[in-house]
A protein has these predicted regions:
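Structure-specific DNA junction-binding interface
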Residues: 1-78
Length: 78
C-alpha cells in the first residue's frame, strides 16, 4: 500500500492525498507516519476492489483522508 500512496503523491491524484500529507506533516507527523496513516485510509478501498470486485470509492477515500490522524473506520484495529 505504501507504494500505491507514493504513486498517488507523485501523480498528485487524488489531490487529497497530497493535501493530507502536508496537513499531517504540519501537525507534527513524520513523513513515514503520514504515509502509514494515508495507507490506513487506502486499505478499505483496496480490500473492496480486490476481494469484493467493487469500484474504487474515491469519495469514501477522501472522507477517510479528511479524518486522519483519527481512524474510526478501523474500529478496534487501530
Amino acid at each position: 500500500l505504501f507504494e500505491v500512496v507514493e504513486n498517488q503523491l507523485a501523480d498528485n491524484y487524488p489531490k487529497q492525498v497530497t493535501e493530507t500529507l502536508m496537513r499531517l506533516r504540519m501537525t507534527g507527523h513524520s513523513r513515514d507516519e503520514a504515509i502509514e496513516l494515508i495507507a490506513c485510509a487506502l486499505a478499505p478501498e483496496m480490500i473492496d476492489v480486490i476481494e469484493h470486485q467493487q469500484s474504487f470509492n474515491l469519495e469514501r477515500y477522501a472522507a477517510h483522508l479528511a479524518q486522519l490522524p483519527e481512524t474510526p473506520w478501523l474500529g478496534d484495529e487501530a
